Amino acid sequence: MKKRKALWVTMILLILVSLGIWLYQGDLPAEVVDAKYTSPSSQFLTLDDGARIHFRDEGNRTGLPVVLIHGSMASLHAWTPWVGRLGKTYRIVTLDLPAHGLTGAVPSGDYSGAAQLRVVQAVTSHLNLDAFVLGGNSMGGGVSWRYALEHPESVLALILVDASGPSAWYQARREAKPDKASPLAFKLLGQSWFRAIAARIDPYYLAVQGAKSAYNDSPVVTDALIMRYYELALRAGTRDAILGRFNSWQGPGRQSEDLSVLTQPTLILWGREDSVISVTTADQFQAAMPHSQVIIYDGVGHAPMEEVPERSAEDVRRFLKALKRGEV
């Protein structure tokens, strides 16, 4: 009996060790990832706390500045389709927030919302942008309207693309009807047991499932797009930084910001099939913000700027032209 028990214990240990080896994935050297995902437009700004922020300043340098902020787990590469379509007329500035893209981990370990706002301010100040249009997708949309609340004098207009809203909106929705369709990575990162191992396991499956879910199985989800998410996540230090960011957001409570004080003209763009942030949130934004307009894209998921770049860029162009004429 003892021999049989010892055999079973040994077999279980071997299975667990084999599973751990199979799931394990080490980091990729930062210099290797950087070499692949930088472009001739890439620049790096070192802040006082040692953080090295990756940003791009592209398009028409004499045009109206438009600053665009990516979403959670994404990078400034998400805005490439708009840069190509809007850059002839507008100056397009994109950046990688801490724990993302080629910015990655920062020495301070501060991945809070306040730190995100400081990065936006640092980059725009570095570029001497006193006033600009500010836009963002998902988490980046939340960064955008929060920045406008803190620096209303700097933000001429807002572009919110499937943007995150005040946390109280989502807390109430989760309690009423838990969302079962969103990318698996976001659900798992909400679990303490997964965060304990997430920095060492291979995130490839999560990258595939997350992209297909967020992009509503759009044909833009190519092998290259999946590898971009995957390799940027594996950049040395980034997975630990992602965990630091999610840990810093645990237990947000029911705080709510008064969006009605935002008087800037606001364009709200949303994919009707968004599995990350419900399309009903677009109506909440419009109800909360007095000078806003909404455009909904049928058959589109969480990233209209990538899924329907021509249509969404044209809607932005129309909005910015109306802004210049004082018609919004």
Which residue stretches match the model-derived regions?
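Conserved alpha/beta-hydrolase catalytic His-Asp/Glu region
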Residues: V33, Y170-R173, R195-V261
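Flexible "cap/lid" loop of the alpha/beta hydrolase fold
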Residues: L149, I159-R195
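Conserved HGGG/HGGXW glycine-rich cap/lid loop of the alpha/beta-hydrolase fold
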Residues: E58-L102
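Active-site loop/oxyanion-hole signature of alpha/beta-hydrolase fold enzymes
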Residues: D48-G50, R56-E58, T94-G135, M139, ...
